[in-house]
């Protein structure tokens, strides 16, 4: 990377120093997903970007902090002592790094307790009845079963449409097992999130759902659910891909029964806190670029990719700027939000703290997709999905010309900025992006951004016992940090601002 940085620095010196009003070619009409083009921002910030890329190549502080977080704090579910340990540790980490105005914003978070849990299916075998344990994880915020568990016949359902076509008599008193296949996280999580109440409306006593992953390794993936207040709360759990497929096969042959036991329950809310530290702006300290991820995790694995890698890459991004002595005009605020996984209380509290000063929020950057090989940045205010997904066959790319002139100009500015990231292969920008923690900001018009990575394995480990430090490659981690650092610094220092749009508007 160092050689590329030197080339970039030399090329930058050949450019003039134009103003931000000329953010791209006069007829620029950015095409979503296309590589960036070098323009006035690349000319102005090429030297500083090269310094950041070179420093990031050898900086080990971020990965060292991630290692400590994973190995010495561990899983960090909201409401647990481990999360509050992480909050205190995170604040001290920022102080030692020399960030200013380090504070912990109090946030009340839910306390969901998993307790003991198990599941087994019973069906007819060649030599007699077979009882086979299921690989399961209760879904976050689920209620538990009655004492002794629930034993009930299974009804297999592939989709919500198939469920809607069933009569209540076909579902009442049964355990519904969903296996919609794998169509990407956004599709599959609809079943995990809303399936329990959908089947409860027809009288089901519990729900099991195929884990939201395309990888079959007998590993269940947890995640949160949301109950419909109008329906009874029934217990719900995720099962492995293999178990879901086997139940589907067996249900075609004859009766299948499942015994489900879950001690899950809610305790009283617990105080935690968003951790914040800043590089105060040299000219416009009241204007803020927020960058971060979520400090909490599920109660399985180490929360390494989700989202330890995100917060520590953001930490390294900000501290690189500080170490290099760069002085952005605006304030850069590093935020470790809490309770992203099962409530979103941290993001809402952060928005409430900002209050009527929302217009001073210049941009919000959230990293919550893992730290695999970086490809570039997503610009959520230009529309598109939060998470990148493969388009359907024959689908047409979004027409950038349909966007407002302000959004088009901002897309051009982002293409200009990401052109600085060519040395690490992260020089693309796509419409889409954002995150749960910054959604309360972006809903009120703050420009939303998030890293785009290959994401080749993220959902193999996501919300499982396998989300451990060894899944985070140190080289790719540093590239992500470098990408975030360059983008954050330019957004905090450039003369103009990206355009945002409120929810439902352009």
How would you describe each model-predicted region?
Residues 49-57, 71-82, 118, 141, ...:
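Second-shell loop/turn segments in exported
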Residues 64, 72, 319-345:
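Short helix-loop-beta-strand segments that form the rim/entrance of peptidase-like active sites
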Residues 319, 323, 459-506:
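His/Asp/Glu-rich mid-to-C-terminal helical/loop segments that flank catalytic regions of hydrolases
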Residues 24-45, 67, 71-175, 181-182:
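Noncatalytic luminal/extracellular "stalk/propeptide" segments of secretory-pathway proteins
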Residues 5-18:
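Bacterial N-terminal signal peptides
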Residues 234-239, 244, 251, 284, ...:
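Metal-dependent peptidase/peptidase-like ectodomains
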Residues 39-80, 217-224, 296, 368-372, ...:
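N-terminal capping segment at the start of a domain
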Residues 46-48, 124-125, 136-168, 225-304, ...:
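Soluble metallo-hydrolase cores and metallopeptidase-like ectodomains found primarily
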